[in-house]
Amino acid sequence: MATPPSSEDSADEGPSNIGEAKFPILEPPLPATICGLAKLLEIPLDDCLIPCNFCGNFLTHLEVCEFDEKKLTLIWKDHLVFACCRVCCSATATYEFNQFYESTVLGRDIEQVTGKSVFDIHVRCYTCMKFLDSIEKLDICGRKRPFYLVRGSWKGICRLCKHFQ
């Protein structure tokens, strides 16, 4: 009669590969917004201290709120997170405009140039980098003010920055 193998017999065969599959560990995607980061960390937005990528200063609570309102994206470097403060955001917008300006289109002509409705065109403020809403884009069209093509993206001026010019 054959005896069943004991645990000692199977130990001679070496380590088992069962359960040791070599699959890459998938990490969850890193949040793109400060609100998303606060939710992931389960902390209030007020407790988020995020340094500016350019000057290193921590964003104020108002700048944290503006960052998400402008629909800007967090910068991740080796699992460290950075954002952009108001001053550096404005400086970056100015630099980008001066270095990468391509063309100017007045008012409703943007629809002819792009082949899209003004409501379907993504436009950021060339001063503060906020995404323009429909009313702001219509205001530019109605007043025959300029839209600028900068680095392949459309720029205009938001209602707040318009008052500082």
Curated annotation (Swiss-Prot):
Matches recorded under Gene3D superfamilies: E6 early regulatory protein
Primary localization class, coarse: host cell
Presence of keyword Zinc: yes
Cellular compartments annotated: Host cytoplasm; Host nucleus
InterPro entries from the UniProt entry: E6, E6_sf
Cellular component annotations (GO), alphabetically ordered: host cell cytoplasm; host cell nucleus
GO BP term (any one): symbiont-mediated suppression of host type I interferon-mediated signaling pathway
HAMAP family, A to Z: HPV_E6 (MF_04006)
Oligomeric form and interacting partners: Forms homodimers. Interacts with ubiquitin-protein ligase UBE3A/E6-AP; this interaction stimulates UBE3A ubiquitin activity. Interacts with host BAK1.
Protein name: Protein E6
Organism whose genome encodes this protein: Human papillomavirus 20
The organism's taxonomic lineage, starting at the top: Viruses, Monodnaviria, Shotokuvirae, Cossaviricota, Papovaviricetes
